[in-house]
Amino acid sequence: MTSLLEIKDLTAFYGPLRAIKDVSLSIQEGSVTALIGPSGCGKSTLLRTLNRMHELSPGAKVKGQVLLDGRDLYQLDPVYVRQEVGMIFQRPNPFPTMSIRENVLAGIKLNRKRIHRIQQNELMERCLRSVNLWDEVHNRLGRPGGELSGGQQQRLCIARAIAVSPRVILMDEPCSALDPVSTKAIEQLICKLKEKHTIVIVTHNMQQASRVSDWTAVFNVARSGGSGELVEHDKTEVIFTSPKNEVTLNYISGKFG
């Protein structure tokens, strides 16, 4: 298995505030990597640096490198980067006034890709089937995406993301606003999606991390008001059964966080 994303000595700032410090991490192609750790340790900040969303925040900047297949993301067109590296947010965010069909195809139209309507319909159906949503919505594709349940909306957002064929999908707490049944559906979907995509997921749910991920990276803040730092990165089974770092052991055993 080869590294698709390489994070090298990455430090991220919000104005004068240093959110994460000197993070180096390899993301394996075709795998699910979970980022875990207590609140405020920089997990979501790191995730946002991986498709250049971090720089959209006022005063935000990064030092270090993020390489996609050896190419520095910060030397590439950000529009291209976000085609290659999609993002799923904590709360489902379908475009509320767009139909289900329009939501799936939104990225295609945003990127001005011209494809025939027949091809559009084939792509839409393929993406909705990929997220196990087609059977639930095929007879109401013209209805607004905002009418769907929370779990359905999140799957619609994933269908929208994969429509542009990203190599990497970032997920920031994708199940935190969902009920247990919808959470199970998303977790099953994550395991299916890694056949075609590399996935990086931020989660506070350690059981979820152990269920869906192949690799786990543990983050922590060394002191109050300090920067988030990478503590340990290893195969998920190792992290949860025989961690090498005492901080990791204390976190997964519930002694803090």
From Swiss-Prot:
<keyword id="KW-0813">Transport</keyword>
<dbReference type="GO" id="GO:0005524">
    <property type="term" value="F:ATP binding"/>
</dbReference>
<dbReference type="GO" id="GO:0016887">
    <property type="term" value="F:ATP hydrolysis activity"/>
</dbReference>
<dbReference type="InterPro" id="IPR005670">
    <property type="entry name" value="PstB-like"/>
</dbReference>
<dbReference type="GO" id="GO:0035435">
    <property type="term" value="P:phosphate ion transmembrane transport"/>
</dbReference>
<keyword id="KW-0592">Phosphate transport</keyword>
<dbReference type="InterPro" id="IPR003593">
    <property type="entry name" value="AAA+_ATPase"/>
</dbReference>
<keyword id="KW-0547">Nucleotide-binding</keyword>
<dbReference type="InterPro" id="IPR017871">
    <property type="entry name" value="ABC_transporter-like_CS"/>
</dbReference>
<keyword id="KW-0472">Membrane</keyword>
<dbReference type="GO" id="GO:0005886">
    <property type="term" value="C:plasma membrane"/>
</dbReference>
<protein>
    <recommendedName>
        <fullName>Phosphate import ATP-binding protein PstB</fullName>
        <ecNumber>7.3.2.1</ecNumber>
    </recommendedName>
</protein>
<dbReference type="Pfam" id="PF00005">
    <property type="entry name" value="ABC_tran"/>
</dbReference>
<dbReference type="InterPro" id="IPR027417">
    <property type="entry name" value="P-loop_NTPase"/>
</dbReference>
<comment type="similarity">
    <text>Belongs to the ABC transporter superfamily. Phosphate importer (TC 3.A.1.7) family.</text>
</comment>
<feature type="binding site">
    <location>
        <begin position="37"/>
        <end position="44"/>
    </location>
    <ligand>
        <name>ATP</name>
    </ligand>
</feature>
<comment type="function">
    <text>Part of the ABC transporter complex PstSACB involved in phosphate import. Responsible for energy coupling to the transport system.</text>
</comment>
<dbReference type="InterPro" id="IPR003439">
    <property type="entry name" value="ABC_transporter-like_ATP-bd"/>
</dbReference>
<feature type="domain" description="ABC transporter">
    <location>
        <begin position="5"/>
        <end position="246"/>
    </location>
</feature>
<keyword id="KW-1278">Translocase</keyword>
<dbReference type="GO" id="GO:0015415">
    <property type="term" value="F:ATPase-coupled phosphate ion transmembrane transporter activity"/>
</dbReference>
<keyword id="KW-1003">Cell membrane</keyword>
<comment type="subunit">
    <text>The complex is composed of two ATP-binding proteins (PstB), two transmembrane proteins (PstC and PstA) and a solute-binding protein (PstS).</text>
</comment>
<keyword id="KW-0067">ATP-binding</keyword>
